[in-house]
Regions:
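Anionic, Ser/Thr-rich low-complexity intrinsically disordered regions
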Residues: 1-73
Length: 73
């Protein structure tokens, strides 16, 4: 496995971990909405996690394009 493949595997792991955190945070936000006043902190954390996910997905796209370039050489 070359360096690019290792970076891709790492990016995939990080994305999977973020997705799990986002699911948990969405449950926290939903619970806050269902039980009382909204929680700005919980919503802010969810927004930050979703923003991080978008960044990691873009990073993964860059890694994939580099991997494809390597294979075509």
């Amino acid at each position: 496995m070359n360096h690019v493949q290792k970076y891709l595997a790492q990016a995939n792991r990080q994305i999977a971990e973020l997705m799990v955190q986002i699911v948990r945070q969405r449950a926290i936000v939903k619970h806050a909405f269902d039980t009382g006043p909204r929680s700005e902190m919980a919503e802010s954390m969810l927004n930050a996690l979703e923003g991080s996910l978008r960044i990691f997905e873009k990073h993964r796209e860059l890694i994939l394009s580099q991997l494809l370039r390597q294979r075509s050489e």
